[in-house]
Amino acid sequence: MSLKTTAAALHNRNQVLESFEKALNTNDSKKREQLMTFIIVGAGATGIELAGALAEMRKFILPHDYPDLDTSTMRIILIDGGPRLLSAFSPQSSEEVKKYLTHLGVEILLNQQVKNYENNMLVLDDGNFIESANVYWVAGVKANSLAGLPAECYGPGNRLRVNEHNQIQDFKNIFAIGDTALMISEEYPKGHPQVVQPAIQQAMNLIKNLRNIESHELNKESEKYRKGPAAHPF
């Protein structure tokens, strides 16, 4: 399952609730275990937020809405091929988030690659496997290319290199915001995290800039975008 659109996100939320319903009504212990195991592949901002949301759902929603389900049987497993969570953030932020997710009961597997997933069986590159009916793939996401822009406009993840006003490199009248924008600074050497808060703030700043561009009064607030909730413990 992916999380690339609002419709997909709503569908996945319904799938989570449907898994709870099925687990509640099955007498097959193996099937129940698969339904209550949630695997997230990719420990970037999206994967971290999803893991935290599921952990909070287990803590606050399950006991209230599904009192007959044993919440201890719900597993949340976060898998990433890298050595740490949130590779785009500082090591300190990565460690803080790791500690917090561990405190919430999220199982974290680092330096692990997914080799295959079929028939509710996820196989890792070391030969180990996990049975689950719920796998969310949020790893390796990159932006689409825009026809007509030279290759040097693109950075890691195919994101467009922009200045502090969100103007694409070498262009004064083309802008990029949100996930597609790569605004490199001393504070964010790998660009801002691809989450909601920076995108909203960039959009608001761009509105002001478009209104003022003719008078050459571009705002400089874009350098101060907040990281959003993914950068801190939930």
Where does each model-flagged region fall?
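FAD-site-proximal beta/loop scaffold in flavoenzymes
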Residues: 2-27, 121, 129-208, 212
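Rossmann-like NAD(P)H-binding beta-loop-alpha module
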Residues: 14-71
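Short helix-coil transition/hinge motifs at the ends and kinks of transmembrane helices
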Residues: 26-31, 64-66, 184-190, 218-223
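Active-site flanking residues adjacent to catalytic metal/cofactor-binding acidic residues
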Residues: 41, 48, 79, 177-178
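A Rossmann-like FAD-binding core segment of flavoenzymes
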Residues: 56-164, 170, 218-219
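C-terminal, flexible cofactor-proximal segment of oxidoreductases
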Residues: 202-234
